[in-house]
Amino acid sequence: MSYREVSRVLIMAGGTGGHVVPALSLARALRARGVSVEWLGSPRGIENRLVPAADIVLHRIQVAGLRGNGMAGWLLAPWRLAKAVWQARQVIAKFDPQLVVGLGGFASGPGGLAAWLMRRRLIVHEQNAVAGMTNRYLSRLADGVYAAFPGAFGAHRAEVVGNPVRDDIAALGETPRGSDALRQRPLRLLVLGGSLGAQALNTQVPQALARLPAAQRPDVRHQAGRDKETATQSVYAEAGVEAEVSAFIDDMAAAYDWADLIVCRAGALTIAELAAAAKPSILVPFPHAVDDHQTLNARQLVDAGAARLMPQTQLTAESLAETLATLLEPETLATMATSARAQARLDAVERLVAGCMEANRDSQ
């Protein structure tokens, strides 16, 4: 069977960039092989901005998560699920995909159930080190189960393929930055708080840097998040530390390329990008992540010696300053960079595409 014999694939992913960005990488790879791709999402997730921008048809169904919705949410859940499944069945009937691929998010649950009820081939991919509720359920119905991390589905068998990473980011790590290059200029620290920002990083990083001797301080670029740029600039000014602060970073590949050490959260996509780009890191997992999955994500790089783990409960100016002082050495950073690249799974997209073709081949 050739790739062109699979002509239509429906991708289900939504909510956050951690689901949508890897799914977009898969969509681009499928389209490059002549496959028609459409998307199933919800009305409020980031897919509403990113998917149309990629010139992909986006179908929206009315669906929301169950966790945190209280007793009323659970009582209404069966009716809401039935409605969402009915909407998803309409999308599938109209687009008539040969394969449905779920990568997490609210729409994947009813969409995957609709695909199973309509006897369409279904595969799922889990980006985090522990599978979310939707993917755990769908893994029991799916024809193929893929994971970025070993053990994501517990005892359920899954093929570990990693997370898709953009080509321009993966290319950065082809030659990890060595100690000789790092000695030629001031070291560079990149702080990433995500689109909403991370208040703990915005307050503690400037104060930690202030504790370092001026000669040891790196050049700093700090992405502070929406509506947090001015306040973060003030914290740096009060600490007497120079930094370039921005609300967002439009070109992540350029930002990674600039950096020698990165302080950030431990989302699944971030972990994959750090490894691919060969970037040492200090990882501060988001403490309220479901099932504490960011801490589990971080273990891949931490156990390999490519990152240091700093739980937010232990994040103080003193502890961070001590860690920075230890890591801001050319030899240390060079060793960590090599270790990070060794953890990269650069063929994740190709293996997912192959999985799509294999699932469809089995149906012939």
From Swiss-Prot:
GO terms for molecular function: UDP-N-acetyl-D-glucosamine:N-acetylmuramoyl-L-alanyl-D-glutamyl-meso-2,6-diaminopimelyl-D-alanyl-D-alanine-diphosphoundecaprenol 4-beta-N-acetylglucosaminlytransferase activity; undecaprenyldiphospho-muramoylpentapeptide beta-N-acetylglucosaminyltransferase activity. GO terms for biological process: carbohydrate metabolic process; cell division; cell wall organization; lipid glycosylation; peptidoglycan biosynthetic process; regulation of cell shape. Keywords: Cell cycle, Cell division, Cell inner membrane, Cell membrane, Cell shape, Cell wall biogenesis/degradation, Glycosyltransferase, Membrane, Peptidoglycan synthesis, Transferase. It is an enzyme of class 2 (transferase). Transmembrane segments: none annotated. NCBIfam families: murG (TIGR01133). This is UDP-N-acetylglucosamine--N-acetylmuramyl-(pentapeptide) pyrophosphoryl-undecaprenol N-acetylglucosamine transferase.
